[in-house]
A protein has these predicted regions:
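N-terminal export signals
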Residues: 5-24
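Short, glycine-/small- and polar/acidic-enriched structural segments
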Residues: 25-179, 183-190, 209-211, 216-217
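Short linear loop/turn motifs
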Residues: 63, 71, 167, 209-212, ...
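Flexible glycine/proline-enriched surface loops and loop-helix/loop-strand junctions
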Residues: 131-134, 177-178, 222, 243-245, ...
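Short, surface-exposed acidic
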Residues: 160-164, 203-207, 268-279, 318-325
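Pocket-lining segment of extracytoplasmic ligand-binding domains
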Residues: 171-175, 182-268
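Secondary-structure end/capping motifs
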Residues: 232-314
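Conserved C-terminal helix/tail region of periplasmic/extracytoplasmic solute-binding proteins
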Residues: 304-342
Length: 342
């Protein structure tokens, strides 16, 4: 109550300016958001914003749903089932080129450093990325790390076509990796490390080849949004991005609060594990030179272009998107409201 009272006392004018549709409609604006995955630390900033009333303070009634990966989330946003979703930007580019009428755009960057990676055992034969040539790697066809692997491989000087991919359900695949059935596993690094830790193989036993450490400049996930929502309710989209930014800045400053929000939404979640995951996300994808300079959610033209170019190379796309058809910054809050605090 004290926080909310203080917020009302000091920020009422700002809130009304950010959400002028409140007065016009006299009610909260409904907004649907897809996490793109199950309830875990990757969605902590959104869940914390909801828990702390940031969306409501800006005039929104936000419904946050779980998802089944980026491809599914993007399709749902493209079909109008959701206003926005957390999703891999490379997958969004691929979707837009296949469905030009969809016209989805990213309105904020969630993972400034790309979290895609390949994970191997320290005591195994793979000591450097080039050693992956001809090896067996766990990774499903929809897996973003698998889809972007060709860019990583070519940058390291080996032919990706010689790799044998094993399409095994993640839970079963993780267990088999620990048993030694595969040479490597393709994952978001924070997902793979903790999945394997839960099966008895700790981070100290693993080497992680993060694509961003080996030349990849692409952004990771962003807030992918529906064009009708952006056009018909621009103030609602601005309010959503501003409140979500607030939630993620809180998580960066206080990861324990973010993990607690995950636990509050999903009582079966392991709060300690989600705290560890959130710390990996914060330190590994959000506390970066770019976000420290430009704030959470912002993007630079050079890296946006790199995201397009690397996606085209990885997916074998015959055409690409101009930046204006892929990204807009008009829904971002002010630089002061994006600034990292922790």
């Amino acid at each position: 109550m004290q926080r909310r009272s203080l917020l009302r006392a000091t920020g009422a004018a700002t809130l009304l300016a950010a959400a002028p549709f409140i007065r016009a409609q006299g009610a909260l604006q409904k907004f649907k958001f897809n996490l793109g995955w199950k309830v875990e630390a990757s969605g902590a900033g959104f869940l914390l914003a909801l828990q702390r009333g940031y969306y409501k303070d800006l005039g929104l009634d936000v419904q946050i749903d779980t998802g089944n990966g980026s491809a599914s989330a993007i399709s749902l946003v493209g079909g109008g089932a959701y206003d926005s979703a957390s999703a891999d930007l490379s997958s969004m580019i691929e979707f837009n080129l296949a469905n030009p009428q969809a016209a989805l755009k990213a309105v904020a960057i969630q993972y400034d450093l790309n979290p895609n990676s390949v994970i191997v055992r320290k005591d195994g034969p793979i000591k450097k990325p080039g050693d992956l040539a001809g090896k067996t790697i766990l990774g499903q066809p929809f897996n973003a790390s698998r889809k972007l692997f060709p860019v990583f491989a070519k940058a390291q000087g080996f032919d990706p076509s010689g790799v044998k991919w094993e399409n095994v359900a993640p839970d079963i695949g993780d267990t088999r990796f620990v048993k030694g059935d595969f040479d490597a596993a393709a994952y978001f690094f924070f997902t793979g490390l903790l999945n394997l830790k839960a099966r008895g193989m700790g981070p100290e036993q693993l080497n992680v080849f993060r694509f961003s450490d080996y030349g990849m400049k692409s952004y990771g996930n962003g807030l992918v949004s529906n064009p009708k929502s952006m056009q018909d309710n621009p103030d609602a989209m601005k309010a959503f991005v501003k409140a979500s930014t607030h939630g993620w800045l809180d998580c960066i400053a206080d990861p324990k609060a973010g993990a607690a929000a995950v636990k509050a939404r999903e009582p079966l979640a392991n709060e300690a594990l989600e705290l560890e995951r959130l710390q990996l996300i914060v330190d590994g994808t959000m506390k970066t030179p770019d976000t420290k300079a430009n704030g959470w959610g912002a993007a630079t033209p050079a890296r946006l272009q790199a995201t397009i170019d690397e996606t085209a190379a990885a997916f074998g796309l015959k055409s690409t998107l101009p930046l204006a058809d892929f990204w807009t910054d008009k829904f971002l809050p002010s630089a002061a409201d994006r600034k990292l605090r922790g």
